[in-house]
């Protein structure tokens, strides 16, 4: 009954963006919030950092550098996703191609929006993030709650509810449907 792609183990290319306090307006500027679907926001992710005034790629922005092209794991600083509670920020990062975001901390609402959009937010200490950023690819094992480079593994914490949803590929609707018979029974009792 999976409604989203389950995350069990994931190996991907990383891109470091070690700024602290990256807010949702920096992730997806409000000028781009005119869409009514979840898709199509990727080209606008980090818009003000990603592009030069003439619209060309900013060569100094890490995700634009050739060695980071195709990265699906973002390693970033503390307090990622702070600011307004727009879910568009998670949509933009997912549409950009990120599956996992590793930060020192997250805004609570942004963290929840990631999990609701099949992205895994992971909290790790700065030394662990700096170590992982030295590698081209790293591996995440959600059932065992580890992030590994070729030479070292780091444990991370995640609420069992979020972990269950992501490991089993369950969105809110799929979870509700698990209780369909109880819901029907209750409705008949009214």
Swiss-Prot record:
- Keyword Cell wall biogenesis/degradation tagged: no
Keyword terms, alphabetized: Amino-acid biosynthesis, Branched-chain amino acid biosynthesis, Leucine biosynthesis, Lyase
Pfam families reported in the protein's UniProt record: Aconitase_C
Gene Ontology cellular component list: 3-isopropylmalate dehydratase complex
* SUPFAM superfamilies assigned to the protein according to its UniProt record, in alphabetical order: LeuD/IlvD-like
EC number(s) per entry = 4.2.1.33
Q: What class of enzyme is it?
A: lyase
Gene Ontology MF annotations: 3-isopropylmalate dehydratase activity
Presence of the UniProt keyword DNA repair in the record: no
- Record-level GO BP terms: L-leucine biosynthetic process
Q: In which pathway does it act?
A: Amino-acid biosynthesis; L-leucine biosynthesis; L-leucine from 3-methyl-2-oxobutanoate: step 2/4
Write down the chemical reaction(s) this protein catalyses: (2R,3S)-3-isopropylmalate = (2S)-2-isopropylmalate
* Subunit: Heterodimer of LeuC and LeuD.
Report the family membership.
Belongs to the LeuD family. LeuD type 1 subfamily.
Purpose: Catalyzes the isomerization between 2-isopropylmalate and 3-isopropylmalate, via the formation of 2-isopropylmaleate.
Q: What protein name does the entry list?
A: 3-isopropylmalate dehydratase small subunit
What gene name does this entry carry?
A: leuD
